[in-house]
């Protein structure tokens, strides 16, 4: 897999109260990923970008909500997230990452 593809797979860390609790309790981190990303791609991208050992990857597809604005029905974009579990003793520091 090309280095360019690995850099494009991860869009951003998903920062929320639930993701912070997962990171503290069970060494799981949540990332927003491109819609066509696969588990092996996400695993390889996290391992190469953050120099950590990934134990498992779970993927979630979230449908976009239907909204009404000024009488018109519209749809928000969907989202794909990856929950990455690291090997014991590993952690990712987003504040110190470059």
Curated annotation (Swiss-Prot):
It comes from the Bacteria. GO terms for cellular component: ribonucleoprotein complex; ribosome. Transmembrane segments: none annotated. The keyword Ribonucleoprotein applies. InterPro entries: Nucleotide-bd_a/b_plait_sf, Ribosomal_uL23-like, Ribosomal_uL23/eL15/eS24_sf, Ribosomal_uL23_CS. The keyword RNA-binding applies. Keywords: Ribonucleoprotein, Ribosomal protein, RNA-binding, rRNA-binding. GO terms for biological process: translation. GO terms for molecular function: rRNA binding; structural constituent of ribosome. Disulfide bonds: none annotated. One of the early assembly proteins it binds 23S rRNA. One of the proteins that surrounds the polypeptide exit tunnel on the outside of the ribosome. Forms the main docking site for trigger factor binding to the ribosome. Belongs to the universal ribosomal protein uL23 family. Part of the 50S ribosomal subunit. Contacts protein L29, and trigger factor when it is bound to the ribosome. HAMAP family: Ribosomal_uL23_B. This is Large ribosomal subunit protein uL23. The lineage of its organism: Bacteria, Pseudomonadati, Pseudomonadota, Gammaproteobacteria, Thiotrichales. The gene is rplW.
């Amino acid at each position: 897999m090309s280095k360019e593809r690995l850099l494009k797979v991860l869009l951003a860390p998903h920062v929320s109260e639930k993701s912070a609790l997962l990171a503290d309790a069970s060494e799981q981190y949540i990332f927003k990923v491109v819609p066509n990303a696969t588990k092996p791609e996400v695993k390889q991208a996290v391992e190469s970008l953050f120099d950590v050992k990934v134990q498992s990857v779970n993927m979630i597809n979230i449908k976009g909500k239907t909204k009404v604005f000024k009488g018109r029905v519209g749809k928000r974009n969907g989202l794909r997230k990856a929950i990455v579990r690291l090997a014991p003793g590993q952690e990712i520091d987003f504040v110190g990452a470059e």
